[in-house]
Amino acid sequence: MSSNNLITLHRWLLSDTHKNMENKLEMANLFSGIALACKITNNAIKRAGFESNFGLAGITNVHSEDVKKLDVIANDAFKMALKSTREVFCMVSEEEDSIIPVSQSQAGKYVVAFDPLDGSSNLDCNVSVGSIFSIWPKASKDHNYSNDDVLRKGRDMTAAGYALYGSATMLVLTFGQGVYGFTLDNHIGEFVLTHVEMRIRTKGSIYSINEGNSVFWDKATQEYVKAIKSGADGRAPYSSRYIGSMVSDIHRTLLYGGIFMYPGDTKSPNGKLRYLYEVAPLSFIMEQAAGKSTNGSSPCLDMIPKSIHERVPVFMGSPACIDELLAFQKKFNHNHSTTSQHEKDN
């Protein structure tokens, strides 16, 4: 974008681009907090080698995962920056086991769920990582938060986004009116609009999945991956690209097309990814970019979680790829169900 037409995130949020966006000033304030948290996190990552912030913090989180030092820094940055906006009612973090309260004097009317540092297991080898967030209006009529405020259908989100800390630092977001990308200009310290109305290709030729788990997949997933790898029906074989950092894998899928998959399997029936702050916000972005996201039977955005850290299977990407995946799910899982019922009857 020309330096004569720099549109910063704050300027964009207040522009006429969002004539239909409710509470524009509140959203601008809230996103100023998110942008600040992302800048703090980005700076901590870039300086981690100098400040001995790589490696483990010596604790585990609610998921029994080893917590990295940078996980702690990013989590603290998001909590501090979000509370300071006075727009947040309560929060959910991937790093904490329960709802995070906000004092009544600071509380606003939005619920924010976030993964402060997705893919942090890759940090020590300098792989790109990210932050993910989702925003809902609060459900409570008073100042007392409850599970009803956070256990929400994805389709009821007000906004969602992710930050990618890679060769460049990007903030990608949606308010339900398309997807926009902002790149951090380190010279001026601002996120600047660089990607307007991002849209995924109708069909792609890249698949992204951890094939180390293939022995645990159901028949439908095994056969689908086998088909796209082999170039069945005379088509060109898909290329495999899997980083193991969800933000990085989704960002590539969004730009180049294709499909990202983290299915449930016999080892982890509900998959690995958490709904509120991973699957739901990235599904919202994918749908707003003309893509699709499913748990294998229904759209991810139509789900309502039963717990704040609930895990769900997910397949998302180019619509033609998802439609083909669902055809395999219908064919093979239906056949499996029919066979199982026949064996049971006999």
UniProtKB/Swiss-Prot annotation:
Signal peptide: none annotated. Mg(2+) 2 binds at E94, D115, L117. Pathway: Carbohydrate biosynthesis; gluconeogenesis. The lineage of its organism: Eukaryota, Amoebozoa, Evosea, Eumycetozoa, Dictyostelia. Belongs to the FBPase class 1 family. It comes from the Eukaryota. Binds 3 Mg(2+) ions per subunit. Homotetramer. It is an enzyme of class 3 (hydrolase). This is Fructose-1,6-bisphosphatase. Its cofactor is Mg(2+). It catalyses: beta-D-fructose 1,6-bisphosphate + H2O = beta-D-fructose 6-phosphate + phosphate. It comes from Dictyostelium discoideum (Social amoeba).
